[in-house]
């Protein structure tokens, strides 16, 4: 049965208009983006199938075009739509972060980092550069490595902070393997970086580790020097 044959109150678009987007399931929201299904499957059925295949909405929305194209009804148009949605969401979160006092709004930082780094396939490190009021100046990518290796040079982070006239910074990196727990190397690197930043009167406020499911804060774990 096509969605047009459903009771009006159960159709995703009508349901959104009547009850708001939060009332829709992941599959219903995705169906609105997909617009149409495939032969024998409504857009909602296709959305449910794709969510089951990819395991989560985040993995589906960040899938590469080649992988999406392996599924009937999916291709470059769907990939483009998903990429646009992700980028709009990232920019909205960045705007919220830019307007917030970072230390008083750690959830916004965590949400931004999860959205920005959580679905990366390789390890990526970023720095959030802050002014004296702990407001965001800029977000800069520090490095991008393989799944198991990522090299960050402390002197480059120090130079970046000075070039941006930052008073403090937060660093973050993802663990593509899925475990958010800090390694001994993560802890030692954080200590060395904090010491180096103190020599130029810039504070290292926190170090976050990000996975697709969670975010860990060194400060909350009691691991900041």
Swiss-Prot record:
Domain MPN, chain residue ranges per copy: 102-224
CDD domains: MPN_DUF2466 (cd08071)
GO biological process: proteolysis
InterPro entries reported in the protein's UniProt record: MPN (IPR037518), RadC_JAB (IPR025657), RuvA_2-like (IPR010994), UPF0758 (IPR001405), UPF0758_N (IPR046778)
Sequence motif: JAMM motif, positions: 173-186
Residues the entry annotates as binding Zn(2+): 173, 175, 186
One annotated GO molecular function: metallopeptidase activity
UniProt keyword annotations, A-Z: Hydrolase, Metal-binding, Metalloprotease, Protease, Zinc
Residues making up the signal peptide according to the UniProt record: none
Tree of life domain: Bacteria
Tagged with keyword Protease: yes
PANTHER family per record: DNA REPAIR PROTEIN RADC (PTHR30471), UPF0758 PROTEIN YEES-RELATED (PTHR30471:SF3)
Family indicated by similarity: Belongs to the UPF0758 family.
Name by which UniProt lists this protein: UPF0758 protein NMC1174
């Amino acid at each position: 049965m096509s969605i047009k044959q459903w009771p009006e109150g159960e159709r995703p678009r009508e349901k959104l208009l009547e009850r708001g987007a939060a009332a829709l399931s992941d599959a219903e929201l995705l169906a609105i983006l997909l617009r149409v299904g495939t032969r024998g499957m409504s857009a909602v059925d296709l959305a449910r199938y794709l969510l089951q295949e990819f395991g989560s909405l985040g993995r589906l929305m960040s899938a590469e075009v080649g992988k999406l194209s392996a599924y009937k009804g999916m291709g470059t148009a769907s990939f483009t739509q998903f990429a646009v949605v992700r980028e709009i969401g990232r920019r909205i979160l960045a705007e919220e972060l830019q307007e917030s006092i970072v230390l008083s709004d750690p959830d916004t930082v965590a949400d931004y980092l999860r959205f920005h780094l959580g679905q990366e396939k390789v390890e990526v490190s970023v720095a959030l550069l802050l002014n004296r009021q702990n407001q965001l100046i800029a977000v800069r990518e520090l490095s991008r490595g393989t799944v198991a290796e990522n090299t960050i040079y402390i002197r480059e982070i120090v130079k970046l902070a000075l070039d941006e006239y930052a008073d403090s910074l937060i660093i973050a990196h993802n663990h593509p393997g899925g475990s958010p727990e800090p390694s001994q190397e993560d802890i030692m690197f954080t200590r060395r970086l904090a010491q180096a930043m103190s020599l130029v009167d810039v504070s290292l406020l926190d170090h976050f580790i990000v996975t697709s499911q969670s975010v860990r804060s060194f400060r909350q774990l009691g691991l900041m020097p």
